A protein has these predicted regions:
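Glycine-rich anion-binding loops of enzyme active sites
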Residues: 1-74
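Glycine-rich beta-alpha junction loops
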Residues: 41-43, 60, 64-69, 77-80, ...
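Glycine-/charge-enriched secondary-structure boundary and capping motifs
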Residues: 3-9, 28-35, 85-87, 92-103, ...
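Acidic, glycine-rich loop-and-beta core segments that form the ion-binding/anion-interacting portion
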Residues: 54-100
């Protein structure tokens, strides 16, 4: 666990400055635990991203998802009935097993976003978490602005079409739930 957290810190250019282990006997079954973390950052006032300069014609740049991340796992568990699912099952759509695919580490976007900010005037950033595209993108937009996305241009990890097919989930619901 610590090695994985340390690798995440390296990818983000962050320091792991503390931590604690809360022992809660009787709360979790044996061999189970809960892990939570957060980051805090600082930025020069002149470099704060301010969407007030956003205007019609600005480009929307989508960074590709590495998979389900932490969004929609309740729905994933329901679709595959995870308690009874064979996580070692191979699906033609996936490059690995279902379990390997679902455990794909969440991509850390810090370095690509910072590199982009060196090249262009970034006017807004939206992380696609719970609520998917439909709730998160509007929060990043300036008043009176809308984003038009060409869904066919988005590179979607194969787990998402598989979830949609197996779960019989309408496409709008997929974009409202997952970070596709």
């Amino acid at each position: 666990i610590v090695a994985g957290v340390a690798e995440g810190c390296v990818q983000a250019g962050a320091a792991l400055v503390g931590g604690e282990t809360a022992e809660m006997p009787g709360f979790y079954p044996e061999q189970e635990y809960d892990l939570a973390g957060f980051t805090v950052g600082v930025v020069e006032k002149s470099k704060i991203i301010d969407n007030t300069k956003m205007q019609a014609g600005d480009a929307v740049i989508a960074l590709p998802s590495s998979g389900v991340h932490s969004n929609g796992f309740s729905l994933v568990r329901k679709i595959f009935n995870v308690e009874y699912a064979d996580i070692w099952q191979h699906y033609d759509e996936l490059s690995g097993t279902l379990g390997e695919t679902l455990l794909t580490p969440t991509k850390i976007y810090v370095k690509p976003v910072l590199a982009l900010m060196e090249q262009v005037d970034v006017r807004a950033v939206s992380h696609i978490t719970g609520g998917g595209f439909y709730e998160n993108i509007p929060r990043a937009l300036a008043a009176g602005c809308v984003a038009k996305l060409e869904k066919k241009s988005l590179r979607m990890p194969p787990i998402f079409p598989l979830l949609q097919k197996v779960g019989k989930i309408p496409r709008p619901d997929m974009f409202n739930t997952f970070n596709m």
